[in-house]
Curated annotation (Swiss-Prot):
Family per similarity comment: Belongs to the SPC24 family.
Organism this protein belongs to: Gibberella zeae (strain ATCC MYA-4620 / CBS 123657 / FGSC 9075 / NRRL 31084 / PH-1) (Wheat head blight fungus)
Chief location of this protein within or outside the cell: nucleus
Gene Ontology molecular function: any one: microtubule binding
Function: Acts as a component of the essential kinetochore-associated NDC80 complex, which is required for chromosome segregation and spindle checkpoint activity.
Keyword terms: Cell cycle, Cell division, Centromere, Chromosome, Coiled coil, Cytoplasm, Cytoskeleton, Kinetochore, Mitosis, Nucleus
Coiled-coil portions: 39-124
Subunit architecture: Component of the NDC80 complex, which consists of NDC80, NUF2, SPC24 and SPC25.
Compartments it resides in: Nucleus; Chromosome, Centromere, Kinetochore; Cytoplasm, Cytoskeleton, Microtubule organizing center, Spindle pole body
GO CC term (a single one): nucleus
Xref: Pfam families: Spc24 (PF08286)
Keyword Cytoplasm: yes
Protein name listed in UniProt: Probable kinetochore protein SPC24
Length: 201
């Protein structure tokens, strides 16, 4: 009976008996899933390529900046800048030392002028030494004598304008080339300052 049927009919009945519809549906689902996965993969590849291009551009930019910095800051320029700064530092230090020396010299000049002014005030405007000696107070003579002795030793002392006490002494040592300015405090005795002055001289 099978041999009497048409081949096409036989094939059709065979296919129906196999019931391949669920398999076709499964294959369709698998094909759809593969297509979805391929789309997701293509999207991730495009995103990775975009990130790679962005990083490549950033790398090129940073490389260019690095090359420019290396070119503009060569070792020779760095050494030249260091030498220039050292020279400027030396000149600044020398100028500061010169200014300090000038300030000390001017302070000595001012102290000397004050001492001379004090001496002239004690002598009087007329300049008559004998008459002035008769008119002057013995205390003024003692002060004048002390000032002369101190000045002969290289010491200029100044009074405080408020209470008239000796407040500052400028000691010059021409042999050593030293200058010391001493602010005299009442809590130290005259013996202490006398010893200090002699040690400084």
């Amino acid at each position: 009976m099978l041999l009497s049927e048409e081949p096409a009919t036989l094939i059709h009945h065979t296919i129906e008996n196999f019931n391949i519809a669920p398999d076709k549906t499964a294959v369709a689902r698998v094909t759809e899933s593969l297509a979805t996965l391929q789309q997701a993969r293509d999207l991730r590849v495009r995103e990775a390529e975009s990130s790679l291009k962005k990083l490549s551009r950033q790398l090129a930019t940073h490389t260019s900046r690095h090359d420019d910095l290396v070119t503009s800051h060569s070792s020779a320029d760095h050494a030249s800048n260091i030498a220039r700064l050292d020279t400027l530092k030396f000149r600044t230090a020398k100028a500061a030392a010169d200014a300090e020396t000038d300030a000390e010299r001017l302070a000595l000049t001012a102290a000397d002028l004050k001492a001379r002014l004090r001496e002239l005030e004690l002598q009087g405007v007329e300049g008559d030494a004998a008459a002035n000696a008769r008119r002057r107070d013995p205390v003024d003579d003692e002060v004048l004598l002390r000032l002369k002795v101190y000045r002969s030793l290289g010491i200029d002392i100044e009074r405080d304008e408020r209470d008239g006490e000796w407040s500052k002494a400028v000691i010059r040592n021409d042999r050593k080339g030293d200058v010391h300015v001493v602010n005299m405090d009442k809590k130290f005795s005259r013996f202490f300052y006398a010893n200090y002055f002699w040690q400084t001289l």
